[in-house]
Swiss-Prot record:
It catalyses: S-ubiquitinyl-[E2 ubiquitin-conjugating enzyme]-L-cysteine + [acceptor protein]-L-lysine = [E2 ubiquitin-conjugating enzyme]-L-cysteine + N(6)-ubiquitinyl-[acceptor protein]-L-lysine. The BRCT domains recognize and bind phosphorylated pSXXF motif on proteins. The interaction with the phosphorylated pSXXF motif of ABRAXAS1, recruits BRCA1 at DNA damage sites. The RING-type zinc finger domain interacts with BAP1. Residues 165-198, 321-362, 492-581, 640-767, 864-899, 947-995, 1030-1056, 1147-1185, 1205-1230, 1244-1289, 1313-1343, 1437-1547 are annotated as: Disordered. It comes from Mus musculus. GO terms for molecular function: damaged DNA binding; identical protein binding; p53 binding; RNA binding; RNA polymerase binding; transcription cis-regulatory region binding; transcription coactivator activity; ubiquitin protein ligase binding. This is Breast cancer type 1 susceptibility protein homolog. Keywords: Acetylation, Activator, Cell cycle, Chromosome, Cytoplasm, DNA damage, DNA recombination, DNA repair, DNA-binding, Fatty acid biosynthesis, Fatty acid metabolism, Isopeptide bond, Lipid biosynthesis, Lipid metabolism, Metal-binding, Nucleus, Phosphoprotein, Repeat, Transcription, Transcription regulation, Transferase, Tumor suppressor, Ubl conjugation, Ubl conjugation pathway, Zinc, Zinc-finger.
Length: 1812
């Protein structure tokens, strides 16, 4: 008791010290929501806010008195994680010790039951697994007795009891306190010890005293995490000393050694300690040698193993495990017990110098003593943590001597100890992976005989491999799922990963640190060395450098031991043990361990197979065998876990991540896959030892992270393999932890988040670009996604290097991983990435490898956007399976990458090879399929390269989801699950689409089908879409249609992320809309930046050559405009696409203003390149697409002019349908539309025209593509509008010039719109990425027309100014006509010719238009178009008839919403017009917007022409898809409506005759006007219905960051809400930042909102609505209180519901100065609350009968003497302004007496961010 009490007290002291460190200096409580000041002091957020609010002057830091401001405060997630972990550790401590931290050392009865053992194990306190601990504590009591009995029997039989006693005496000095802090790990460890509980308990009995002594010796060190290292050092030295003497007394001192080693290693499991002691004894000599190198590590492990917490929790574990072990032993109790005795005997023998000698000699041959010792120690530490590693180590050491005996022993000990850690450790100790595998198998399924035989057989092969110890270790690690030593070897990487995770400070990580602090820390150090050394060591192992290999192995073992414990802690009781094993197994072993944890016996069987595999794998790993790869692939298909494990066996370092992914995925199918995995492993062991092949396969299987690792390891070079192994192990460990958590039952969301955090770090190393980007931990989600993508990309690169291997791996991954658990796998990927990031050195090496594969690194500029690209890259590697593809991929990688920079192919930096290989080498096989079906590429990958395809989808899905929702990881996980199905559908749809290229109608039908399917799997498709996009970018050089499909798929992911419905439609559209339909689909996605993807795809396809050149130039030229777009694009998954579209539109607009034809031509080139970048422009051969569109046009209209107009209209219509994405593009595209229409008339118009050519053109385009009938009706409407416009403008030429001006202005507006859209998109997904993307888009576009773009931009700016002036005038006219719904009718009717022309177009377009309209109707984009701000839309609509921009005006009712919204407004206007045409409801909505008077006549015409189709589309559009469309931007620039009118004409001209400027000027102008008129007509209806409803919500934001503001802007656009900068009477909602409890900070808008009875809504409403893709109920998100007045005063609700004014009957004078609020705002608040405000002090009189109040802010006064004078003069109450603010906050009049200046010292609280 004394020992245990002392050690517990030490731990308690440590916890108290940590608690003291983590307490807030202000409230003296544990920090909550910590914020750091500039002086680096940490305080509670609310404490600081309260402090800042209460101080009159500048606030000072309470500690250093430095000045602090609210703006200088920065959130400290690290400290919050620390505090959270501390709370968890404390809870675990209380659970383990049964005493309150504050209640001294009172043990619970449960603890007392295990008191003796605790005394013995006093050195071990496990704070891990506090959840399962509750369950285990009860188990410990009975379990202890049982364990005692069984241990007594077994130990006595083995002579261990005696040795245990001696050890107790000997070891006390070495005892250290090992605190396992990992919550889940502890549980898992406890569970595992159940397996090893017999031995562990005995050993614990022996070790507790020794451990306790050591703990006492090093109690000071134990107090801190670092102390454990020191203790470990001492302990290790002592252990080594003890072990050396113990060697002399094998049996007696074996326990001692076990204990010292176990203590040093982790002293968690007595059984493990026993076995480990034996194994450690043989290793002791080596340990002594290793100690020098790994002293710190060992000390760490020892300390942690010694920590009393571990002993306590271990006892619980052992008790619990004992039962488990007994159960497990039941099947072969005799065998197991016998083997156990044998194993113990063997261990003792092993401990004997002879045993040590044989074992060591074997180990020495395989692994040098130093390496062996360090490995054993690490394994032992891991065992102590897991509760079974110790036993396993000894068992494995013994196995080296006698494989058969060892196998039985391992089986028994593994069964008893949990077998997971034991076996691994034994394997690590024993250079015989075969033996270990057999032992594990026997232990798992109590097949001792089999195991023994296998161990004997494989043991020999393993011994043979012993000559190359490191490779053997690697092989073992690869077979780690089966072979524990392998796990141990990989553990160093795992530890590293854990360390990184620790840096992330995830709660579990923190706990893990405590639990496996010693193991992990030292291993981390070692790992870093090992990681650096491992590649070399691996090479050495290849060269038979046993010593180095052994060292690496020991390092790995230590790391693994740490990692498995982490896993165990993470997983619940039974799963905990298994999971800890999986963690210790590192990446590959992790999978097996996870399986064993979930299904211990099954998992063990897996391990057996794994072990078998590992045994042969180790020797074979040197000899890569392609046949084995194929076999492995098949096996992995059978069980991805097995495949992954095999891969990891073959590729220890390179495939660690892959095992993680597979492991995580496997747990779900644990039972199912256990045997198959075993089988596969065996096969692999025998046939698939080639590391390269297995690595490649494993990498592909890993899908995201594994492939990455594969890349390096895929190459046979040992160094590279070693490096990647390290990386892989680290990554896999993180992934495993994540997967373990998920599997263990931890909240998937939580796990995902944690893993994401880690991943963000680890991914950096994996990706070329993400390496740089992922380094930042700030954007954890974004970085994670990006990293995931990068990992995928890297994997693909590896695949390119080893195409053969890649192919196999891809197939395996596709069938196994895809089916298994995409979400889990994704989480693992994140974790792995995190780990990888941590391996800076490994990361560097890996990056170098990756860069070797992908020579083009320009995507580094777009690190964040790369995450999607990386996802794409993942799919690319599948294509790169063939060597020629790899070579071509590298060549085209640069071009494709540049093109993809914007289209997220940048993430494919490594993947860029994919587009290229797809185009050239893979084009033949994969690319052709891709081109055949844009969606097919993903499906193609799936079928041909299943693994990569699934991986790519996962990554993409992640990206899209990340952008889609605040919790992208969860979404991405879900997306991954869906993607396989969706992709399957997509494949079919794409195939049908490809076949239907000739038949547009068929394509449209397919699109419909795909649309429906895609809606179901919108997210999935979104993810796959980006992948497809990448592939299609490279693949569809020849096939523009294919490109279109690719872009559509690309478009789909953004839409999907933003809106499931849109995404779904978008995806099908991409497949079906070869020309027009593709455009439509892109338009649907355009709002979400699907356009960006489409454009990127097109660009990469058609403009690859100039893309590289144009990336930078375009960026420079369109930098300003496109930056906005970039934000939008980045926001979306397909950010680049959207960005590029915006850029293209802008450039085109700038070109088109004066030289329309010339601009159109140059723009067509730009568009082609942009199309490569954006999926919309993926018709990169716009000529091909154009012909298709021309065919449609020819069908649509008889007259060329009308045809052009209809084309414009048709294109505009689909664009509108496509979404607001098109709108912002459209504004830029006004002039560019001509070029784009000609070159990429279908695709680009689809994506860009909707935005480019105002609402008119978008509607035209939509009509043509969406529905020929719609287009015809539009055309007929077009003509009247054009006449109206000509009437309004005076003449068509004037109107055209006006249009040009408008188009220029619209380009500018589009820039704004694009900026806003991108910003919003990027806010949701990743704004940073969007920035880069926009640059890329610009640069790509600029490649062909940099000068032209620059000139056009200048012209656009000039025209924009002009347009703004004109629009001001137009707005005035519109306002005048605002009340006249028939304002436009005269002009429409006035153009009978135009009307006639429209009918001509109508019949021609009816067929195609109908199909298009249906598709468009399905597309939510139409709704988006109509969702432009009503007010501006109305104004612009009125304006439009005059300026030809009515529709645009209608589409732009959101100028109030924001400049961004305004910018998109013009494009959105077009989209809305299209939508309106498609659906009268949209028209109605638009009508109220502001063009009711002017556009109602048009509405009538448009409705009549397009009534039914529009009606069909309206419901869909009204469904909220319009949220994704950028309608708000349209409203921003009233000039854009005119531009819209012009754009349709120019678009038609571009599409049909690029050089027909004259026609475009006249007929096009007329057509444009007509279109505008039609759109106006349609728009009013839409506006009246839907937009009126949307108009009900007018929002302002307060206290939000720029990113959050952009998110709100996107949110407003998507749901057609109004977003303004200031609170007005029309404002209904104030969006404010709050905490989880909806408590906000007080801002000026907060006060004004309450005063005005507005909804004060948390920003969470926006986030959640975006995540759930629907407008949630605001009531659930209403602010409840503020940090000053109270956290739940319900003031906002009270103000809304109150019908009486708060300050009614008061006459108030506000006496300046006021520091944080303007006087007029304060007066405004008072007036809103019913007070009578006087401007002059003398005006305060009692005649009115009102109460007189003078509001002052004493803290702002320089002279106090003024206050009494004023009070006396006015005879009014002198009240502090806090009374107004506090009363207003709670909307209750506070007692004036408490705020009277006469009664208070002037200390007022000032509102925060009053200007916000």
């Amino acid at each position: 008791m004394d020992l245990s009490a002392v050690q517990i007290q030490e731990v308690q002291n440590v916890l108290h010290a940590m608690q003291k460190i983590l307490e807030c200096p202000i409230c003296l409580e544990l920090i909550k929501e910590p914020v750091s000041t500039k002086c680096d002091h940490i305080f509670c957020k609310f404490c600081m806010l309260k402090l800042l609010n209460q101080k009159k002057g500048p606030s000072q830091c309470p500690l250093c008195k430095n000045e602090i401001t609210k703006r200088s405060l920065q959130g400290s997630t690290r400290f919050s994680q620390l505090a959270e972990e501390l709370l968890r550790i404390m809870a675990a401590f209380e659970l383990d010790t049964g005493m309150q931290l504050t209640n001294g050392f009172s043990f619970s009865k449960k603890r007392n039951n295990s008191c003796e053992r605790l005394n013995e194990e006093a050195s071990i306190i496990q704070s891990v697994g506090y959840r399962n601990r509750v369950r285990r504590l009860p188990q410990v009591e009975p379990g202890n007795a049982t364990l005692k009995d069984s241990l007594g029997v077994q130990l006595s039989n083995l002579g261990i009891v005696r040795s245990v006693k001696k050890n107790r005496q000997t070891q006390p000095r070495k005892k250290s306190v090992y605190i396992e802090l990992d919550s889940d790990s502890s549980e898992e460890t406890v569970t595992k010890p159940g397996d090893c509980s017999v031995r562990d308990q005995e050993l614990l009995q022996t070790a507790p005293q020794e451990a306790g002594d050591e703990g006492k010796l090093h109690s000071a060190e134990e107090a801190a995490c670092e102390f454990s290292e020191g203790i470990r050092n001492i302990e290790h030295h002592q252990c080594s000393d003890d072990l050396n003497p113990t060697e002399n007394h094998a049996t007696e001192r074996h326990p001692e050694k076990c204990q010292s080693i176990s203590i040093s290693n982790v002293c968690v499991e007595p059984c493990g300690t026993d076995a480990h002691a034996s194994s450690l004894q043989p290793e002791t000599s080596s340990l002594l040698l290793i100690e020098d190198r790994m002293n710190a590590e060992k000390a760490e492990f020892c300390n942690k193993s010694k920590q009393p917490g571990i002993a306590v929790s271990q006892q619980s574990r052992w008790a619990a495990s004992k039962g488990t072990c007994n159960d497990r032993q039941v099947p072969s109790t005799g065998e197991k017990v016998g083997p156990n005795a044998d194993s113990l005997s063997d261990r003792e023998k092993w401990t004997h110098p002879q045993s040590l000698c044989p074992e060591n000699s074997g180990a020495t041959t395989d692994v040098p003593w130093i390496t062996l010792n360090s490995s054993v120690q690490k394994v032992n530490e891991w065992f102590s943590r897991t509760g079974e590693m110790l036993t396993s180590d000894s068992a494995s050491a013994r196995r080296h001597e006698s494989n058969a005996e060892a196998a039985v022993v391992l089986e028994v000990s593994n069964e008893v100890d949990g077998g997971f850690s034991s076996s691994r450790k034994t394997d690590l100790v024993t250079p015989d992976p075969h033996h270990t595998l057999m032992c594990k198998s026997g232990r798992d399924f109590s097949k001792p005989v089999e195991d023994n035989i296998s161990d004997k057989i494989f043991g020999k092969s393993y011994q043979r491999k012993g000559s190359r110890p490191h490779l053997n270790h690697v092989t073992e690690i690869i077979g780690t799922f089966i072979t524990e030593p392998q796990i141990t070897q990989e553990q160093p990487f795992t530890n590293k990963l854990k360390r990184k995770r620790s840096t992330s400070l995830q709660p579990e990580d923190f706990i893990k640190k405590a639990d496996s602090a010693g193991v992990q820390r030292t291993p981390d150090n070692i790992n870093q060395g090992t990681d650096l050394m491992e590649p070399n060591e691996q090479a050495v192992s290849t060269t038979s450098n046993c010593q180095e290999n052994k060292i690496a192995g020991s390092n790995l073992q230590k790391e693994k031991s740490a990692h498995p414990t982490e896993s165990l802690r993470k997983e619940p009781a039974s799963t905990a043990g298994a999971k800890s094993i999986s963690n210790s197994v590192s990446d590959l072993e992790v999978e097996l361990n996870v399986h064993s944890s979930k299904a211990p016996k099954k998992n063990r069987l897996r391990r057996k197979s794994s072990i078998r595999c590992a045994l042969p794998l180790e020797p074979i790993s040197r000899n890569p065998s392609p046949p084995t790869c194929a076999e492995l692939q098949i096996d992995s298909c059978g069980s991805s876990e097995e495949t992954k494990k095999n891969h990891s066996n073959q590729q220890p370092a390179g495939h660690l991540r892959e095992p993680q992914l597979i492991e995580d995925t496997e747990p779900a199918a644990d039972a199912k896959k256990n045997e198959p995995n075993e089988h596969i492993r065996k096969r692999r062991a025998s046939d698939a030892f080639p590391e390269e092949k297995l690595m490649n396969k494993a990498g592909l299987l890993t899908s995201c992270s594994s492939p990455r690792k594969s890349q390096g390891p895929v190459n046979p070079s040992p160094q590279r393999t070693g490096t990647e192994q390290l990386e892989t192990r680290q990554m896999s460990d993180s992934a495993k932890e994540l997967g373990d958590r998920v599997l263990g039952g931890e909240p998937s969301g939580k796990t995902t988040d944690r893993s994401e955090e880690s991943t963000s770090v680890s991914l950096v190393s994996d990706t070329d670009y993400d390496t740089q980007n992922s380094v930042s931990v700030l954007d954890a989600h974004t970085v994670r996604y990006a990293r995931t993508g990068s990992a995928q990309c890297m994997t693909q690169f590896v695949a390119s290097e080893n195409p053969k291997e890649l192919v196999h791996g891809s197939n395996n991954a596709g069938s196994g991983t895809e089916g298994l658990k995409p979400p889990l796998r994704h989480a693992l990927n994140l974790s792995q990435e995190k780990v990888e990031m941590e391996d800076s050195e490994l990361d560097t090496q890996y990056l170098q490898n990756t860069f070797q594969v992908s020579k083009r690194q320009s995507f580094a500029l777009f690190s964040k956007p790369r995450s999607p690209q990386k996802d794409c890259a993942h799919s690319v590697p599948s294509k790169e399976l063939s060597p020629k593809v790899t070579a071509k991929g590298k060549q085209k990688e640069r071009q494709g990458q540049e093109e993809f920079e914007i289209s997220h192919v940048q993430a494919v930096a490594a993947t860029v090879g994919l587009p290229v290989p797809c185009q050239e080498g893979k084009l033949a096989a994969d690319t052709m399929c891709d081109r055949g079906c844009r969606l097919c590429p993903s499906s193609h990958y799936r079928s041909g390269e299943n693994g990569l395809s699934a991986t790519g989808k996962s990554g993409i899905s992640q990206n899209s989801h990340f952008k889609q929702s605040v919790s992208p990881i969860r979404s991405s996980i879900k997306t991954d699950n869906r993607k396989p199905l969706t992709e399957g559908r997509f494949e079919r749809h794409t195939s049908s689409t490809e076949m239907a290229v000739g038949n547009e109608n068929i394509l449209q039908s397919t699109v419909h089908t795909v649309s429906l399917n895609n809606r179901g799997n919108a997210c999935q498709e979104a993810g796959s879409g980006s992948i497809h996009e990448v592939c299609s970018t490279g693949d569809s050089f020849p096939g523009q249609l294919g490109r279109n499909r690719g872009p559509k798929v690309n478009t789909v992911p953004p839409l999907d992320s933003m809106q499931p419905g849109v995404c779904q439609q978008s995806v099908p559209v991409s497949d079906k809309y070869l020309e027009i339909k593709k455009q439509e689909g892109e338009a649907v996605c355009a709002d979400f930046s699907p356009c960006l993807f489409s454009d990127h795809l097109e660009q990469s396809m058609s403009g690859k050559v100039f893309q590289v050149c144009s990336e930078t130039p375009d960026d420079l030229l369109d930098d300003v405009e496109i930056q906005g777009h970039t934000s939008f694009g980045e926001g979306d998954i397909m950010e680049r696409s959207a960005v590029f579209n915006g850029s293209i539109l802008r450039r085109e607009s700038s070109r088109s203003p004066s030289p329309v034809t010339h601009a159109s031509k140059s723009q067509s080139l730009h568009r082609a390149s942009r199309k490569l970048e954006s999926s919309e422009e993926s018709d990169s051969t716009e000529d091909e697409d154009l012909p298709c569109f021309q065919h449609l046009l020819s069908r649509i209209s008889n007259t060329p002019e009308l045809t052009r107009c209809s084309s414009a209209v048709t294109q505009r219509m689909p664009e509108k349908a496509e979404g607001t994405q098109a709108p912002w593009k459209g504004s830029s595209s006004d002039c560019n539309n001509e070029v784009i229409m000609i070159e990429a008339s279908q695709e680009h118009q689809f994506s860009e025209d909707p935005r480019c050519s105002g609402s008119m053109f978008s509607s035209q385009h939509s009509a043509a593509q969406g529905s020929t009938a719609n287009a015809n009706s539009q055309d007929s409407n077009f003509i009247p509008p054009s006449k109206q416009r000509s009437h309004q403008c005076g003449n068509e030429e004037a109107f055209l010039s006006d249009k040009e001006l408008i188009s220029d202005n619209e380009e500018m507006a589009t820039c704004l719109e694009e900026d806003n859209d991108q910003e919003e998109d990027s806010i949701i997904p990743d704004s940073e990425a969007s920035g880069y993307e926009s640059e890329t888009n610009l640069s790509e576009d600029c490649s062909q027309s940099d000068i032209l773009t620059t000139q056009q931009r200048a012209t656009m700016k000039y025209n924009l100014i002009k347009l703004q002036q004109e629009m001001a005038h137009l707005e005035a006219v519109l306002e005048q006509r605002g009340n006249q719904p028939s304002g436009h009718s005269p002009s429409l009717l006035a153009d009978p010719c135009a009307l006639e022309d429209l009918p001509d177009l109508e019949p021609n377009m009816s067929g195609a238009a109908i199909l298009t309209s249906k598709n468009i109707n399905e597309n939510p984009v139409s709704q988006n178009l109509k969702s432009a701000c009503d007010d501006k839309f109305q104004l612009q609509h009125l304006e439009g008839p005059t300026s030809g921009d009515d529709e645009s005006g209608m589409g732009r009712p959101s100028p109030f919403k924001s400049p961004l919204a305004g910018s998109r407004g013009s494009a959105h206007g077009c989209s809305r017009h299209l939508q309106k045409r498609n659906s009268p409801s949209q028209e109605e909505l638009l009508q109220p917007a502001g063009s009711e008077a002017s556009s109602e006549p048009h509405n009538s015409t448009g409705q009549s022409c397009l009534p039914r189709r529009e009606l069909e589309g309206t419901p869909y559009l009204g469904s909220g898809i319009s949220l994704f469309s950028s309608r708000d931007p349209e409203s921003e620039s009233p000039k854009e409506p005119a531009h819209i009118g012009t754009t349709p004409a120019s678009t038609s001209a571009l599409k049909i005759p690029q050089g027909q400027v004259a026609f475009r000027s006249a007929a096009a102008a007329g057509a444009d006007k007509a279109v505008v008129g039609i759109v106006s007509k349609i728009k009013p209806e839409l506006t009246s219905s839907e937009e009126r409803a949307d108009r009900d919500i007018s929002m302002v934001v307060s206290g939000l960051t720029p990113k959050e503001v952009m998110t709100v802007q996107k949110f407003a656009e998507k749901y057609r809400l109004t977003l303004t900068d200031a609170i007005t009477e029309e404002t209904t909602h104030v969006i404010i930042k709050t905490d989880a409890e909806f408590v906000c900070e007080r801002t000026l808008k907060y006060f004004l909102g309450i005063a005005g009875g507005k909804w004060i809504v948390s920003y969470s409403w926006v986030v959640r609505s975006i995540q759930e893709r629907r407008l949630l109920n605001v009531h659930e998100f209403e602010v409840k209180g503020d940090v000053v007045t109270g956290r739940n005063h319900q003031g906002p609700r009270r103000s809304r519901e109150s019908r009486e004014k708060l300050f009614k009957g008061l006459q108030v004078y506000c006496c300046e100065p006021f520091t944080n609020m303007p006087k007029d705002e304060l007066e405004r608040m008072l007036q809103l609350c019913g007070a009578s405000v006087v401007k002059e002090l003398p005006s305060l009189t009692h005649d009115t009968g009102a109460h007189l109040v003078v509001i002052v802010q004493p803290s702002a006064w320089t002279e106090d003497s003024n206050c009494p004078d004023i009070g006396q003069l006015c005879k009014a109450r002198l009240v502090m302004w806090d009374w107004v603010l506090d009363s207003l906050s709670s909307y209750r009049c506070r007692d004036l007496d408490a705020y009277l200046v006469q009664n208070i010292t002037c200390d007022s609280s000032e509102p925060q961010d009053s200007n916000d």
